[in-house]
Amino acid sequence: MTVKQSEASRLGPIFDVCRDDGRAALIGYLPTGYPDVTTSVHAMVALVESGCDIVEVGVPYSDPGMDGPTIVKATEAALHGGVRVRDTLAAVEAISAAGGHAVVMTYWNPVLRYGIDAFARDLASAGGYGLITPDLIPDEAGQWLAASEEHRLDRIFLVAPSSTPQRLAMTVEASRGFVYAASTMGVTGARDVVSNAAPELVGRVKEISDIPVGVGLGVRSGEQAAQIGGYADGVIVGSALVSALGDGGLTALRALTEELAAGVRQRAAAS
């Protein structure tokens, strides 16, 4: 079975531009509200200015079962600071105003509490391109699929090395924009060695679809970004950016983002 990427994808043209440049897209994640709401928004704009093609705007959640310790600590701080979903939507607006491309990454419970259609409507109004839902599977996403069609939003589901062929095909078919490939089993976090399972997982998706594949869960350096950019359409970085922001503020965040952006372009120069 071959699954054709939907022409209605909002993110598709961004991946097309990167592909024309001979490189992967750089996708950076930060949680809203860390270390505080205002700084987090400035940080996301800094990602755009420093070379991120797509910014993942995180909605802090009290039970982040798939996040590593760095992101858990940051989201706990954001929640203690009183962050709200509306702050995430404001961050999306700021990214859009800066010429960037924002998707929201959230566990499903905050969307249910907000209201699925209302969230989709407000995300689209803020200039968002789509939603990454790590704990939502396509079988249980009927209302979200309908809302994403109504409001022209991309829907990014996760696949993992453990995904069966049937599960992989179902997830890819339900996705639009890109598929999020978990390069290691378990929770997220920066690692010194990127999982060998990632190229195989990307290859499995490519066998059945032309949808772009983003690989995350471990990148921390420009060298790793170049490595992953050799086989993936998108290089996703989260924990390392959160650490840079927490340890060195906007200056360190910009420096790491520029290194990562150079990394995906190194791959282009080598190809």
From Swiss-Prot:
The active site is at residues 56, 67. It is an enzyme of class 4 (lyase). Its EC number is 4.2.1.20. InterPro entries: Aldolase_TIM (IPR013785), RibuloseP-bd_barrel (IPR011060), Trp_synthase_alpha_AS (IPR018204), Trp_synthase_suA (IPR002028). This is Tryptophan synthase alpha chain. The keyword Lyase applies. It catalyses: (1S,2R)-1-C-(indol-3-yl)glycerol 3-phosphate + L-serine = D-glyceraldehyde 3-phosphate + L-tryptophan + H2O. It comes from Mycobacterium intracellulare. Keywords: Amino-acid biosynthesis, Aromatic amino acid biosynthesis, Lyase, Tryptophan biosynthesis. The keyword Lyase applies. HAMAP family: Trp_synth_alpha.
